[in-house]
């Protein structure tokens, strides 16, 4: 570990499952259908998990929360993010900041952006930016068949002055 900040990228995509609760960016959107998945289907939380794990050099979400492990079945994205923060802390890192962009038509998240940023920032103990975009009708997100998220995270060493709080 050289003490320099490290950057990671995470991507997650899930199909929409009619009738399933919609958890996205750490929030429940009661009027929208949610995503299928082993856990709660929160693509934004999952992409953030991948980005943080990647930045810390600890693999990816599949390594930590494998679909074959019943302990993680139905677990919330919030629980997953808390676990990832514990893991990177054990390995001498903390999150410096993160950003996540949701790709899809629905639910619209703009009106809850600041609430989402507050929830995710609290979970990661760091500033988190939230944004959204569409694919102008192209692909599975454009046809409303699924949602995707792309995230970046910067982690810093707890053992280096740059990582001091």
Curated annotation (Swiss-Prot):
Swiss-Prot/TrEMBL keywords: Isoprene biosynthesis, Lyase, Metal-binding
Pathway: Isoprenoid biosynthesis; isopentenyl diphosphate biosynthesis via DXP pathway; isopentenyl diphosphate from 1-deoxy-D-xylulose 5-phosphate: step 4/6
Site (Transition state stabilizer) residue list: 38, 134
The organism's place on the tree of life at top rank: Bacteria
EC number of the protein: 4.6.1.12
One Gene Ontology biological process: isopentenyl diphosphate biosynthetic process, methylerythritol 4-phosphate pathway
Binding positions for a divalent metal cation per the UniProt entry: 12, 14, 46
SUPFAM superfamilies: IpsF-like (SSF69765)
Gene Ontology MF, one: 2-C-methyl-D-erythritol 2,4-cyclodiphosphate synthase activity
Positions that bind 4-CDP-2-C-methyl-D-erythritol 2-phosphate: 12-14, 38-39, 60-62, 133-136, 143
Record note on quaternary structure: Homotrimer.
Gene3D superfamilies referenced in this protein's UniProt entry, alphabetically: 2-C-methyl-D-erythritol 2,4-cyclodiphosphate synthase
Enzymatic reactions: 4-CDP-2-C-methyl-D-erythritol 2-phosphate = 2-C-methyl-D-erythritol 2,4-cyclic diphosphate + CMP
Cofactor binding mode and count: Binds 1 divalent metal cation per subunit.
Stored HAMAP family: IspF (MF_00107)
Entry's family note: Belongs to the IspF family.
The protein, known as: 2-C-methyl-D-erythritol 2,4-cyclodiphosphate synthase
Purpose: Involved in the biosynthesis of isopentenyl diphosphate (IPP) and dimethylallyl diphosphate (DMAPP), two major building blocks of isoprenoid compounds. Catalyzes the conversion of 4-diphosphocytidyl-2-C-methyl-D-erythritol 2-phosphate (CDP-ME2P) to 2-C-methyl-D-erythritol 2,4-cyclodiphosphate (ME-CPP) with a corresponding release of cytidine 5-monophosphate (CMP).
Cofactor(s) listed in the protein's UniProt record: a divalent metal cation
Enzyme class: lyase
């Amino acid at each position: 570990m050289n003490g320099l900040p490290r950057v990671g990228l995470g991507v997650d995509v899930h199909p929409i499952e009619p009738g399933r609760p919609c958890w996205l960016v750490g929030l429940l959107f009661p009027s929208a259908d949610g995503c299928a998945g082993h856990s709660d289907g929160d693509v934004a939380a999952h992409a953030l998990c991948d980005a943080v794990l990647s930045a810390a050099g600890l693999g990816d979400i599949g390594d930590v929360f494998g679909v074959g492990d019943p302990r993680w079945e139905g677990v919330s994205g919030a629980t997953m993010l808390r676990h990832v923060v514990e893991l990177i802390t054990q390995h001498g890192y903390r999150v410096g900041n993160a950003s996540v962009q949701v790709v899809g038509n629905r639910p619209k998240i703009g009106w809850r952006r600041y609430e989402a940023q507050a929830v995710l920032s609290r979970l990661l103990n760091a500033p988190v930016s939230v944004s959204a975009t569409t694919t102008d009708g192209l692909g599975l997100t454009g046809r409303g068949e699924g949602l995707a998220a792309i995230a970046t995270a910067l982690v810093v060493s707890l053992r280096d002055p740059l990582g001091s709080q």
